[in-house]
């Protein structure tokens, strides 16, 4: 009986000691009002060295970048650059972001550019970055080949047969270029996208015998015939 009583008292005593130690550890190791301070002070900051744009496959893309110590935040813009001379903002331009990621809407067959600039921190006397980090991003299928301006398209594919591929192939015509096609182009069982430039369509002139043949699907985009 006494042994059981002693063991129970001992157990309660140990539990109390552990609880006190845990509480003390929490109060010493954490202060909910404390703030973390960077060691980077009185510095000219640089923009992030690594910017990643990831397609979420749901009509959006996430822009991520590495932390720049001593920063007071980041200035982020995302542009449609189908026409590089007339960048179109997607979402808020020069958005202030207190973090390392942001999400934007995206569309098919579009070229984009993400810009991330580090902002200064007055408390640490750190100066903002002079230039933004830039990252190109596209929702275009990767180009398999680009057909030179002035080429007969049928002759091009005779000289450059389609590779064996289980994935869709994409062939580009040069923006504003002119082309001819005077014979049959047979893509067989390969899925192909045949495209020009969204802003400055190339033009293809068909001869009497010209036609495309496919049994796997052909997408023709941004080309005038």
Regions found by a protein language model. Give the residues of each.
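Recognizes extended acidic, P/S/T-rich segments that occur
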Residues: 74-110
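Acidic Gly/Asp/Thr-rich repetitive segments characteristic of extracellular carbohydrate-active
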Residues: 139-180
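Pro/Thr/Ser/Gly-rich low-complexity, intrinsically disordered linker/stalk tracts
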Residues: 27-70, 123-141
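C-terminal motif of bacterial Sec signal peptides marking the signal peptidase cleavage site
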Residues: 21-25
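Extracellular beta-strand-rich solenoid/capping regions of secreted or surface-exposed proteins
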Residues: 180-193, 203-225
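Feature marks extracellular polysaccharide-active and adherence modules
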Residues: 174, 195-197, 221
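Bacterial N-terminal signal peptides that target proteins for export
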Residues: 2-14
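Beta-strand-rich modules
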Residues: 102-126
């Amino acid at each position: 009986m006494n042994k059981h009583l002693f063991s129970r008292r001992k157990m309660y005593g140990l539990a109390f000691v552990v609880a006190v130690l845990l509480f003390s550890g929490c109060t010493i190791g954490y202060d909910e009002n404390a703030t973390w301070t960077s060691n980077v002070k009185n510095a000219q900051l640089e923009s992030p060295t690594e910017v990643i744009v990831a397609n979420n496959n749901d009509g959006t893309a996430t822009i991520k970048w590495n932390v720049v110590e001593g920063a007071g935040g980041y200035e982020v813009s995302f542009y449609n650059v189908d026409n590089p001379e007339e960048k179109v903002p997607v979402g808020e331009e020069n958005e202030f972001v207190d973090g390392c990621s942001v999400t934007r809407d995206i569309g098919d067959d579009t070229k984009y550019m993400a810009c991330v600039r580090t902002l200064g921190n007055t408390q640490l006397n750190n100066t903002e970055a002079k230039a933004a980090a830039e990252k190109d991003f596209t929702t275009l299928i990767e180009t398999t080949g680009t057909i030179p301006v002035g080429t007969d398209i049928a002759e091009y594919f005779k000289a450059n047969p389609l590779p064996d591929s289980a994935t869709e192939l994409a062939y580009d015509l040069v923006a504003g270029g002119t082309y001819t096609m005077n014979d049959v182009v047979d893509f067989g069982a390969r899925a192909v996208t045949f495209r020009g430039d969204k802003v400055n369509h190339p033009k293809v002139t068909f001869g009497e015998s010209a036609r495309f043949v496919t049994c796997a699907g052909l997408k023709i985009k941004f080309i005038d015939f």
